[in-house]
């Protein structure tokens, strides 16, 4: 029996755009506009937005809110495979992460940085495989101003006499980004949630 939450890596899909977003913000190209025609042809392969939607001239904020594959592919190709690879590594992608209850693994290899692999990796497809738990850890690090914390199973253990015998502890795993970068990504995450009337954040 494998737990899908932390033992079964899968293609992360658009949630991986959080990783690409880090590099977009850190490179200072978030104000640049991309012409989104609904698809992008790379090495003879046409890759489309979900539903084939075209969004016209969009910057980082609108590209994130619309979840534009074309925008993120374009930005990843501008940044280059090495930067995208380093972004993934900053979130411990491709590493074995030892937790109290399991070791979580992911597959993250840009395979010599071919353009089609770079482009599809940018929006969570390609060869990338990640567990839902690790994607939650990536999201948590953004919410926590760039500090990724180690998950633990329990807050405390209390015996029959009401005495606490063991406590879970917060432990920092890695710094993934600067607080200013995290704040900018949090801002577009809020905008995305509110644009779909999912919540008011």
Language model: regions and residue ranges:
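Beta-lactam-recognizing serine transpeptidase/beta-lactamase-like catalytic domain environment
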Residues: 1-14, 19-201
